[in-house]
Amino acid sequence: MKYMITSKGDEKSDLLRLNMIAGFGEYDMEYDDVEPEIVISIGGDGTFLSAFHQYEERLDEIAFIGIHTGHLGFYADWRPAEADKLVKLLAKGEYQKVSYPLLKTTVKYGIGKKEATYLALNESTVKSSGGPFVVDVVINDIHFERFRGDGLCMSTPSGTTAYNKSLGGALMHPSIEAMQLTEMASINNRVYRTIGSPLVFPKHHVVSLQPVNDKDFQISVDHLSILHRDVQEIRYEVSAKKIHFARFRSFPFWRRVHDSFIED
């Protein structure tokens, strides 16, 4: 089996990476960072997100595993003390694949410029490049509202525990193939109104954000943030692609939520 290990880059994570590579050397395991079947991330959820985007073109062929060397993460749920056990289980191939939905973001520009497509594991946000943020929200080609405020956030089910939660969005179980739109400081008064609530969209629904005046936006996809100019439309939909995790034991999503936000 081919595998690769990525590290946060701190001393603890780098040492654990070297020890695991040495451990895999006792089994029929080949280190391959070009076409791995298993990708192990050592660090935290940020390190895991980087690993995901590094291999997002090969998601169907890869199963991911996260080891946290700091706080418990939603994607990095193995502890360093369990690394030897993980090596043995992986070498025996004793795992199941669990899949989570992803978010597809398509940015369309003015005439003469090719559209850009992005894949998110957590979320995508849209903010103004400097002026007022005003967009028309269109759902399945039907105008829903004109939004005025600081910005909008569209998240995956697993990503609802990240930025979405801080915006007051609901937490969604990753078995639900959906996406959630939350507002950032919307303007609501006698003249301007928005729905004022998070919106959950099922698979096959398409949400389009269309500029009203300013066409320059700061668009983020997970940890990547880029200034996009002359934007004509931003489209969100549940991706046909999924991320696959190698699971060796039961660790229910709601237990993970409890341990992360209530008590460990």
Curated annotation (Swiss-Prot):
UniProt activity-regulation remark: Competitively inhibited by 5'-thioacetyladenosine (TAA) and di-(5'-thioadenosine) (DTA).
Subcellular locations according to the entry: Cytoplasm
Biological processes per GO annotation: NAD metabolic process; NADP biosynthetic process
Keyword entries, A-Z: ATP-binding, Cytoplasm, Kinase, NAD, NADP, Nucleotide-binding, Transferase
Domain of life: Bacteria
Principal EC category: transferase
Pfam families: NAD_kinase, NAD_kinase_C
EC number(s) from the headed UniProt entry: 2.7.1.23
Binding site for NAD(+): D45, G46, N122, E123, R148, D150, S158, T161, A162, Y163, N164, K165, S166, H223
Keyword set includes Manganese: no
UniProt keyword Membrane, yes or no: no
Catalytic machinery residues: D45 (proton acceptor)
Main location: cytoplasm
Cellular component terms per the entry's GO annotation: cytoplasm
Molecular-function annotations in GO: ATP binding; metal ion binding; NAD binding; NAD+ kinase activity
Quaternary state and interactors: Homotetramer.
HAMAP family recorded: NAD_kinase
Family to which the UniProt record says this protein belongs: Belongs to the NAD kinase family.
Functional note: Involved in the regulation of the intracellular balance of NAD and NADP, and is a key enzyme in the biosynthesis of NADP. Catalyzes specifically the phosphorylation on 2'-hydroxyl of the adenosine moiety of NAD to yield NADP.
Name used for this protein in its record: NAD kinase 1
Organism: Listeria monocytogenes serovar 1/2a (strain ATCC BAA-679 / EGD-e)
Gene that specifies this protein: nadK1
